[in-house]
Amino acid sequence: MKIIYKDGHVDECPQDQELHVIRHTAAHIMAQAIKRLYPQADFAFGPATENGFYYDVDLGDQKLSDEDLANIEKEMRKICKENLAIKPFILPRAEAVKLMEERKENYKIEHMADLADETEFSFFQQGEYVDMCIGPHLTYTKALKAFKITQQSGAYWKNDKENKMLTRINGVAFRNQEELDAWEKEQQEARERDHRKIGKEMGLFMTDDLVGRGLPMFLPAGYTCLLYTSPSPRDTERSR
């Protein structure tokens, strides 16, 4: 698998780094898709993670539905088919800040200010999209073969609750479709074993957001099970 580094040289990717590079590139492609669909998007951080990737983004007042996430994934697939070359470049601080100002990347500008000792910054570009990044990345968008957007959540900028809550969009990416299919199968099996699903199906308990998420209310069958599985006061006394 070929990858490109921030200095522009291309080399084979070490096998133990393949998933990291794939997922990091997937984060960039997802950000490009988001920017195409939501031009007002202002991006924070978008790293690869142990299990996938995410990007934190300020969408203003825009709220995303499941259909919106599906459309973002669809746009990602379109970008992959466009087979855009991923190219790095480096700018001195003043030019880098100016570029981010022109692109209205306010969170990137703030992050650059935090890196006061840096005299230059590296960027990666694919088509119209530019992201501040140290890389490395896949050489073309078409090299991203298997991915899926999984969920959205909230995340504070810089993990500080005093800062603005951003939208975090998560995804997974793998070397090929077979690995993605295996992951999806594992997720389905885990859902089937989930005690919350089994308990509701067996009529053991119910939940209500008005009571509180994660707080089960036992139904008669569940209460009976609880009585049989909980130690009696006599058993507790004997164990002392």
Q: Locations of the language-model features?
A:
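Non-catalytic interaction/regulatory segments
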Residues: 2-9, 49, 59-154, 160, ...
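N-terminal catalytic cores of NTP/NDP-binding nucleotidyl/phosphoryl-transfer enzymes
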Residues: 7-40, 45-47, 58, 137-139, ...
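Short, conserved phosphate-binding/catalytic loop or strand-edge motifs used
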Residues: 48-54
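Mixed-charge, low-complexity segments
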Residues: 204-213
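Conserved small/polar residues in nucleotide/adenosyl-binding loops
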Residues: 228-235
